[in-house]
Amino acid sequence: FVEGVDAEDEGSGILMVNGSPTDSNAALFKRGAHSIIDGSGLRVLAEYDTPGWNPEKAQEWVSGQIAQHGGAIAGVYAANDATAGGAIAALRVANVDPLPIVTGQDAELSAIQRILTGDQYMTVYKAIKPQAELAAEVAVRLLHGEKVTAPLEIQGTPATLLDPVAVTIDDIMDTVVADGFWTVEDICTPAYADACEAAGIG
């Protein structure tokens, strides 16, 4: 996201559409995002903690920011794909062209399709297979009465952190399709057939 945003114009910057203020995961995502953005030189024009991760709330807030900041919005960090969809809807309604870079998380099907059409820049994919393999390993150890250890402890809970994967238009086939998370048939519905062909998917 930081590498992709073009915020060289004076006064330009980004919006941060964070997750729900009552979700502890959202607080971690927000802290992690700030740990990168704050040292990047990007200016945060405004940020919003989205109640209930509600895309309509995200859309409403971004609409207000478009009215206030207009063409100064060079990018939108969204904490998940639902809020990214809300942000993009606001940008579309306001006829913002070209669209600023918008990110998301969760590799939702609608987000993959928005990436194909160029509406969304990327999403964060957390592969299921490594999570399942690690969970199975822990379950087997517990079943055998073995002690389970982890390299980290987060809020008093032993934890192993797995690497998330950034998915852009260039690596849809090598990530979510290769892992069977989504199939080509899932992604390339008639409405997205041309975009799939242009991206070499299918």
Residue ranges and their predicted role:
Residues 1-202:
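A residue-level marker of the well-folded mature domains of exported/periplasmic proteins
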